[in-house]
Each structure stands twice: as structure tokens, then as C-alpha cells.
């Protein structure tokens, strides 16, 4: 029987492979890899039939080199301490790589949500929030959860409401969690953010003529085919945006069955490929666009939501009307110079200022584009080019080391 593959060990194997390209003190690298805090809690909840069930849950804060820490909460019967530690580490490196100023965290509750009523799920969520609050593992300046596998805006609204009741004097209390409904301080565009980020990332990878030539492909998305495994929130929106860009979807796999494509792989999930498998794929010439870059859309837009909560102003409110007036003035000048008239409907269409969702999507696109440029630049620095995952880890490690250096704690 083969030994169990520990998720956290796999993340550290990726880290070590990247660290070998760099010249940083061993102690500093060990500090970056270490999971700073893990809280395992067990609490009872009363089920609808009056019976009591003990619930096990975790919250891991991998790195406090930036505060608050940030990471989702998943509800799944397979949740365990190793998993939340690994996922919190990936969040640390993901945030550093895309320059979102958070440390990494992750949480999970070990339940199969199909076995619980909505009322029971609400009681579990609120009690979990209380336990986090009691131990100082939640707050807009401390640790900010978000949705993950098995959770969504409804669970985040329960968390926010519970925190508001516990921290009544915190004016920034809504910033304690992201992925909330828009009516409760959420941001437009958050639901589809991770899938949209996957699309932006794949688009950037396919835009490189040199990289595509190595795979025997032309640059660009048009005419390419894709198979999407899993049609949850991420898979659905990634498939939709890819299809809109001219990609032909030739397979959509769910738990009932799956189809594999041996040439193009983009990791929308967290840690779907082991370190050994990643190395084998690279040696076979398969391009793997790594998870810590490709699914960073969620945390990027969560960052925008957090900023909105702290500023107490929705995006676009300050500048929308000014931009509309400026654009209208420019259009009027162009009409005079060209002698071509536009209808009022055309003027409105061309001059309308950005809405909140427009600004959020623009910020997400900018993040994904510039982050991929940094990954390609890091890869090209070395005589033996590392794969994209290793290059992404290199970018993240150097960002974190720079933070410690700025703090004067480490050389």
C-alpha cells in the first residue's frame, strides 16, 4: 500500500523547487514555509430533531507577514488539518504573487452539507463564527474569510451578521468577510471572479506566440478547444467566458464521467496536481498554468470588496458622473471637428461612466495580465527555464522576502 500523499508536503515540495533557484537564507525560507497558527475546534449543535452532533472545524493562518490574513471556508466531509494548512499556504503565495496585501489563511468545517437542513447549516455557521471570534481568528484587520467549496454568499452573510452582533463598536465590521451578497456590502462581479480570472489567465498564456509555438499551436484563443472538469461556480464561468472568446468546448466533465485532453491544462482548482505529476507533465512538454496564478481572481476581487467595506463607498460613486461629462465633452469636440453627428442614444452609450462591476472587472484583468508578465519574466531569468508553477513560486517568494526585508526583521 502506497504512503499517503500529504497536501501540505506537496505545497512545500513546490516551494523548495522554486527556492533552489534563489539565494535567500535557509532560516528565512523555513519561516515562510511554516504555518504560523492552526485552530482546531469541536462544538455541539442541536439538529432539527433535537439530537446533538459534535462538529469539527479548523482555521489555519499560514503567514502574518501581511495583515489581515485571507482565505475561504469550505464545507466538506473530507476537511482535515493538513488540507487547511496546505490551502492557507497556497493563499499566502497566491496573494504575494498577485500583489494583494494579505497573508494566507483557510478554514473548513467537516460536514457533508447534504445531510443538514438550512436551519442546521445556519446554526453551524454562526457557531463557527463565534468560535473564531472568541479566539481572535476573524476581523477586518485580523483574518477575513470568504466562500470556498460548499459555501457561498448566504453563508458569508451569516458570518457577517454574527460578527456584527459580536463586534458592535467596529465601524468596519462588514469587512470581516468577503463574498457577501451585494445588499450586505458585497461587490458586483465577485461571484464570477474566479472563473473570469481563469479565462484571463488562459488568454494571457495563449497570447504568447513563443510559448504556443513550443506546443505546436497558434497564438490566441480563437479556434482552440477546451474540456472543463467540474461545472461548479468556477468551471461554469470559465467555460462561459472561454466560449464567448471563440474557444470550442468539446467536453464538460462532472462526477458521472470525465474526458481528458493530453495537451492543454489550466488549474482552476487548488492543488490538483502533485509535485511529481507536475514535473512529469513539464518533461512531456505539457504547459500547466498553475493554480496559484490561475484561480487568483477570487481573492483579487475579494480584496476589492474588502477595500469597499473599509472605505464605505461603492466603486464608481465618486467618479462616474465626472467621467460621463468629460466623455460627452470629448464627443462633442469630435463631432465639431469631423462634422459627423451622433444621436443622443449613441452619445449616452459612448459617454457612460463605469459602473462598479466594470471597475472590478478592469482591476481583475489588470491583475491577471501583469501577474502573468511577472511569471514569464521570472522564468526567463534562468538558463534552465523553470516551469510556470516554479516561476510563480519564485515571484511569490521574492515578494515575501522583500516584505520581511522592509520590516527589518530578516536580511
Question: Residue ranges of each PLM-predicted region?
Answer:
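Glycine-rich, N-terminal phosphate-binding loop and its surrounding beta-alpha-beta segment
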Residues: 41-113
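Glycine/serine-rich phosphate-binding loop and adjoining beta1-alpha1 elements at the start
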Residues: 76, 95-222, 406-407
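NAD(P)-binding Rossmann-fold cofactor-contacting core
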Residues: 245-259
Amino acid at each position: 500500500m502506497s504512503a499517503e500523499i500529504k497536501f501540505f508536503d506537496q505545497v512545500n515540495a513546490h516551494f523548495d523547487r522554486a527556492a533552489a533557484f534563489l539565494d535567500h537564507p535557509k532560516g528565512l525560507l523555513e519561516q515562510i514555509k511554516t504555518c504560523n497558527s492552526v485552530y482546531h475546534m469541536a462544538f455541539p449543535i442541536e439538529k432539527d430533531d433535537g439530537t446533538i452532533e459534535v462538529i469539527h472545524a479548523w482555521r489555519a493562518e499560514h503567514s502574518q507577514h501581511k495583515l489581515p490574513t485571507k482565505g475561504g471556508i469550505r464545507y466538506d466531509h473530507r476537511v482535515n488539518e493538513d488540507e487547511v494548512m496546505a490551502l492557507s499556504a497556497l493563499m499566502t503565495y497566491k496573494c504575494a504573487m498577485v500583489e494583494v496585501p494579505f497573508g494566507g489563511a483557510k478554514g473548513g468545517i467537516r460536514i457533508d452539507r447534504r445531510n443538514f437542513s438550512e436551519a442546521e447549516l445556519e446554526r453551524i455557521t454562526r457557531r463557527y463564527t463565534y468560535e473564531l471570534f472568541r479566539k481572535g481568528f476573524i476581523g477586518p484587520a485580523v483574518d477575513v474569510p470568504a466562500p470556498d467549496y460548499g459555501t457561498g454568499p448566504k453563508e458569508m452573510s451569516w458570518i457577517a451578521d454574527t460578527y456584527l452582533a459580536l463586534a458592535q463598536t467596529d465601524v468596519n465590521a462588514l469587512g470581516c468577510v468577503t463574498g457577501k451578497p451585494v445588499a450586505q456590502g458585497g461587490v458586483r462581479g465577485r461571484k464570477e471572479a474566479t472563473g473570469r480570472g481563469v479565462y484571463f489567465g488562459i488568454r494571457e498564456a495563449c497570447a504568447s506566440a513563443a510559448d504556443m509555438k513550443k506546443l505546436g499551436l497558434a497564438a490566441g484563443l480563437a479556434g482552440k478547444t477546451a474540456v472543463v472538469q467540474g461545472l461548479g461556480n468556477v468551471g461554469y464561468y470559465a467555460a462561459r467566458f472561454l466560449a464567448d472568446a471563440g474557444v470550442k468546448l468539446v467536453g464538460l466533465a462532472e462526477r458521472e464521467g470525465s474526458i481528458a485532453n493530453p495537451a492543454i491544462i489550466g488549474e482552476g482548482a487548488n492543488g490538483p496536481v502533485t509535485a511529481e505529476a507536475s514535473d512529469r507533465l513539464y518533461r512531456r512538454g505539457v504547459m500547466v498554468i498553475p493554480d496559484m496564478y490561475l484561480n487568483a481572481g477570487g481573492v483579487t476581487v475579494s480584496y476589492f470588496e474588502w477595500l469597499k467595506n473599509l472605505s464605505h463607498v461603492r466603486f464608481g460613486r465618486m467618479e462616474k458622473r465626472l467621467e460621463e461629462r468629460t466623455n460627452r465633452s470629448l464627443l462633442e469636440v469630435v463631432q465639431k471637428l469631423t462634422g459627423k453627428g451622433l444621436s443622443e442614444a449613441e452619445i449616452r452609450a459612448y459617454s457612460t461612466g463605469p459602473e462598479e462591476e466594470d471597475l472590478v472587472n478592469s482591476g481583475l484583468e489588470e491583475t491577471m495580465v501583469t501577474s502573468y508578465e511577472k511569471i514569464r519574466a521570472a522564468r526567463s531569468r534562468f538558463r534552465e527555464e523553470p516551469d510556470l508553477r516554479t516561476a510563480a513560486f519564485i515571484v511569490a517568494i521574492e515578494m515575501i522576502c522583500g516584505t520581511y526585508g522592509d520590516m527589518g526583521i530578516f536580511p
